[in-house]
């Protein structure tokens, strides 16, 4: 085959390849209708359940998010798991202990005698640790969590939760599977370090459904025995082959991990050990922020509510994950002025109450116009204008955004796009009088929240599929 033929073959292959990839995700964000989404799969375990939204749904595919809700019963332990994507987790309800294992970081929590004599001494591997008194444990950082906490977790970082309260612990998590930190396909892939998922990963298209086991299950027991310097019998227990408790298990008796005292406030700093720059960046970096404190809100009006934002300025690890969050709480008939996300997609999850939401796409079509309630999820794509009005005594929500410094622009209000336009542009653009143009530009003095004078009108019907 000559050079000309090779070149022709190369361009033909390239054309076919681009055609194939174009067919893989054609017009992902050409959305003429949005819907309030509910979970499509429930994974039950001994100590709780995981509810998974279908991230192949058009609007979630557009946003790039995979979304999950965790319900962990009292004394339930969500076993260590890591993902192929960075994620933000929000504590909707309850209290918990949380631990994360960041690769290469030291065990900074230690000196707690939690194991008795004889444990860990298998095959002469006790290493002389406290014989007769039991040896002392050490592990990476453990944090107390409460309602309103938002946790940033990089890909590949194993994470666990323990419900140490008396009520169910409810968490929601958004993983950005479209981010370049995910080097696999656009599927959420949990890698289990312990436990299993008897129902399998039903959201993975093209894979035969089968039980999902933990990572150790794939290794030969003899290899594990050599790697951990334990017996083959113990190695087989690591594989959880005959146990179907799921990935959330019930803890029997006391949960004796080393933990700090409960936080007295949000400003406390953990003492840091001397180390190199990498350790200071990854190992001691703060990963949790509480968004339920109105005193630290970005927008606060006692009669209307508050809005708090979380971005890479107040939680620097988000710069690495390229994610941010917004927490909102508004009273009945309060309205969030019409706005759009300048540089991010958003996934809005309702944590309390109800609201009427309208959403408009790039064709000027109303693609969403209905009430949304607790437990439902709505995607707001980049540039789609949205307005929210509370229809219950209190409406609360959390938004996850696909940019670490997500920005909004408002259509009405003191800092809106209309306020920045000359009166002549408004008057001529909408064919209205100068007096009407002044009213459009200057009548609304608020920047974000305002009082609604009544229910949102329906006007022209929304576009139906």
From Swiss-Prot:
Domain of life: Eukaryota
Residue list for modification Phosphothreonine: 108
Gene: CRU4
Phosphoserine: residues carrying this PTM: 308, 443
Domain spans labelled Cupin type-1: 34-236, 289-438
Signal sequence coordinates: 1-22
Positions of modified residues (Phosphotyrosine): 306
Localization: Rough endoplasmic reticulum
Region: Disordered, residue numbers: 112-135
Covalent S-S links between cysteines: 29-62, 105-283
The entry's keywords: Disulfide bond, Endoplasmic reticulum, Phosphoprotein, Seed storage protein, Signal, Storage protein
Subunit structure, as described in the record: Heterohexamer; each subunit is composed of an acidic and a basic chain derived from a single precursor and linked by a disulfide bond.
Protein's name in the database: Cruciferin CRU4
GO molecular function: nutrient reservoir activity
SUPFAM superfamilies to which the protein is assigned, alphabetical: RmlC-like cupins (SSF51182)
Residue stretches of biased makeup (Gly residues): 117-133
GO biological process terms, semicolon-separated: seed maturation
């Amino acid at each position: 085959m000559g050079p000309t033929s090779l070149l022709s073959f190369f361009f033909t292959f390239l054309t076919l390849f681009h055609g194939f990839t174009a067919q893989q995700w054609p017009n992902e964000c050409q959305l003429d209708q949005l819907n309030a989404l509910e979970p499509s799969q429930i994974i039950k375990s001994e100590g709780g359940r995981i509810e998974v939204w279908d991230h192949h749904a058009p609007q979630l595919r557009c946003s790039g998010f995979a979304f999950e809700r965790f319900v962990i019963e009292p004394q339930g332990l969500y076993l260590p798991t890591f993902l192929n994507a960075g994620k933000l987790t929000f504590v909707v309800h309850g209290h918990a202990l949380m631990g994360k294992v960041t690769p290469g970081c030291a065990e900074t929590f230690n000196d707690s005698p939690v194991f008795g004599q004889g444990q860990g001494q298998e095959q002469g591997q006790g290493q002389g640790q406290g014989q007769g008194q039991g040896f002392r444990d050490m592990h990476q950082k453990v944090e107390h969590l409460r309602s309103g906490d938002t946790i940033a977790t990089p890909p590949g970082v194993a994470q666990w939760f323990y419900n140490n309260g008396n009520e169910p612990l409810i968490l929601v998590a958004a993983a950005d599977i479209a981010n370049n930190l995910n080097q696999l396909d656009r599927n959420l892939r949990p890698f289990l370090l312990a436990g299993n998922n008897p129902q399998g990963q039903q959201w993975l298209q093209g894979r035969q459904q089968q039980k999902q086991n933990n990572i150790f299950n794939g290794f030969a027991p003899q290899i594990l025995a050599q790697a951990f310097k334990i017996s083959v019998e113990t190695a087989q227990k690591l594989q959880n082959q005959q146990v179907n408790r799921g990935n959330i298990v019930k803890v029997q008796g006391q949960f004796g991990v080393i933990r700090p005292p409960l936080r007295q406030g949000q400003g406390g700093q953990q003492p840091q050990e001397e180390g190199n720059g990498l350790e200071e960046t990854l190992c001691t970096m703060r990963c949790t922020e509480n968004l339920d404190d109105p005193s630290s809100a970005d927008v606060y009006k006692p009669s209307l509510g508050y809005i708090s934002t979380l971005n890479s300025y107040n939680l620097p690890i988000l710069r690495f994950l390229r994610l941010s969050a917004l927490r909102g709480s508004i009273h009945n008939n309060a309205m969030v002025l019409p706005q759009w996300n300048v540089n991010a997609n958003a996934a809005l999850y309702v944590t309390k109450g109800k609201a009427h939401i309208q959403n408009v796409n790039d064709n000027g079509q109303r693609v969403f116009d209905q009430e949304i309630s607790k437990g439902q999820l709505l995607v707001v794509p980049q540039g789609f204008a949205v307005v929210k009005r509370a229809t219950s005594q209190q409406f609360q929500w959390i938004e996850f955004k696909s940019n670490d410094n997500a920005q909004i622009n408002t259509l009405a209000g003191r800092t809106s796009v209309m306020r920045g336009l000359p009166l002549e542009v408004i008057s001529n653009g909408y064919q209205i009088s100068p007096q009407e143009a002044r009213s459009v530009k200057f009548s609304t003095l608020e920047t974000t929240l305002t009082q609604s004078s009544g229910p949102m009108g329906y006007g022209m019907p929304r576009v139906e599929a």
